[in-house]
A protein has these predicted regions:
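Domain-level signature for proteins that mediate thiol-based redox and metal-cofactor handling
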Residues: 2-242
Length: 242
């Protein structure tokens, strides 16, 4: 019965699953993994990683303190099994590491925990890395927008920017300077109209999602360079948006 079940586990396009992916998936549900949500969260990222398989998304939640990922969990209720495996592996790999190093992981880091090479997990590892990077960006935005006395780790994503003191033209200039300095590594350039929208009505979450979107293609190229890929339907959707 087990062999029959394993033979039915496939990836996108009907690609057969391999023993490493199947064993990890079975162990994940038998023993439990890093699913769920940490008790404390100060960064959250999500990606529709498998648009060809599901309308659901993978979420990664982090608790970052002292520039280190202290706790990390994933949720992906309807994603295919291989996205769940990739997400769980990355959470184990990243827990306890510096948050600044989230784009330094390579396929070898996944393979070491998986026990062998799996084409299916290679195709999902990049989506997991992208989701984690978005969670770290979300945390960085919260810190960036916090007041000088701190509190960024607990900043409510729904808080209006005007409640944080960003108002008028001076608020726009101060906001732009903070964000572009924080994300200088990506040569971030924020459209003027966005600055106006944010200061008028925007929230912390609005800023975070826009920054994530502006740097996404750069991040994807870096991830691909690390030997990690994306589900076929994700790549097709990305190409259609180009």
């Amino acid at each position: 019965m087990r062999d029959e079940h394993e033979s039915q586990m496939k990836g996108e396009g009907g690609a057969p699953a391999d023993r490493y992916a199947i064993r990890y998936y079975q162990r994940l549900w038998a023993e439990g993994g890093l699913m769920g949500k940490p008790e404390h969260v100060n960064g959250h990222g999500f990606v529709m990683a498998c648009p060809g398989r599901s309308s659901d998304v993978i979420h990664i939640y982090v608790w970052i303190a002292d520039a280190c990922i202290q706790d990390i969990r994933w949720q992906c209720h309807m994603c295919d099994p291989w996205m769940q495996v990739a997400g769980d592996i990355l959470c184990h790999v990243a827990r306890g590491t510096p948050s600044a190093g989230v784009l330094q992981w390579t396929w070898e880091d996944f393979e070491h925990r998986l026990g062998g090479r799996s084409t299916l997990i290679v195709e999902h590892a990049g989506a997991a890395m992208l989701t984690l990077h978005k969670a770290v960006i979300d945390h960085q935005v919260r810190l960036c927008l916090a007041d000088q006395q701190g509190g960024g780790a607990h900043l409510d994503p729904g808080l209006k920017l005007r409640e944080l003191g960003f108002a008028g033209r001076a608020g726009q200039q101060r906001l732009r300077r903070r964000l572009e300095e924080t994300f200088a590594a990506f040569d971030l350039r924020i459209p003027h109209v966005k600055m106006q929208e944010w200061v008028a009505l925007g929230t912390v979450q609005d800023v975070s999602l826009t920054v994530q979107s502006l740097v996404e293609r750069q991040v994807i190229q870096r991830i691909l360079g690390q030997g990690c890929g994306f589900p076929r339907s994700f790549e097709e959707q990305l190409a259609a948006q180009a």
